[in-house]
Amino acid sequence: IAKLTNVSFFPGSEMDRETVLEFGADQVLIATGSSWRADGLGRATHAPIPGIADHAQCFTPDDIMAGQLPSADAVLVYDDDHYYMGGVIAQLLADSGKAVTLVTPGPEVSCWTQNTMEQHRIEKALLDRGVTLIAKHTLSGVASDSVSFACNTTDRALSIEAPGLVMVTLRAPMSSLYFSLAGEAQEQIDELPFGLLRIGDCMAPNTIAAAVYDGHRAAREMDNWPDPDIVPFKREQSVIDRL
């Protein structure tokens, strides 16, 4: 971006509704990203987990990446994301000297990475570091220093002591800026003096590749944003005439 003469870059400049309106842009793209949930809501559990607020040391990947590691020697990582993040967090904690257990509802750790041919290497890296791996178990409850699971196959209960806990579940869009401009029901969009669009994880948390694609597409379509109710590609439509 720094090489482009028609692009101005302002890092460390958090904006709110007033500063966006004052800027005077013709088009505004909101790409404020997402944050990891800490309540246990995930693919396998469609509601927050009871007792999770009572755990003494419950962290998210955002906390870990900010340098906030559990002080406990034993840490449990619950991975209901199934991509690379759960494995990365477990490796980092193991490399920092923690005794790590990784539990996932999936059939194997980081199971989605079968699509990217990384699963075998991720599992080997975890085992080489002494990480305990438990698959096919879904989180059911959290206490102050332990976590309860149910086996996906037998429904048998399993309780694990977990002085430290890291939740790798779902991410929530950070869309407060967008809705402050568009209105809670997006009823104010037509009243704005500029075009408004949210893209990337701010719209729907996804992979890095998907976020890059979304930004690239939005830039290409900026001068003529398509109607969201119209499919922007040709479709095959079979027509059968009566005989």
Where are these regions (language model features)?
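Glycine-rich dinucleotide-binding loop and its adjacent helix/turn
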Residues: 3, 9, 17-18, 37-96, ...
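A Rossmann-like FAD-binding core segment of flavoenzymes
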Residues: 1-38, 60-63, 71-72, 95-185, ...
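A conserved FAD-binding loop/helix module that cradles the flavin
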Residues: 78-92, 96, 108-114, 119, ...
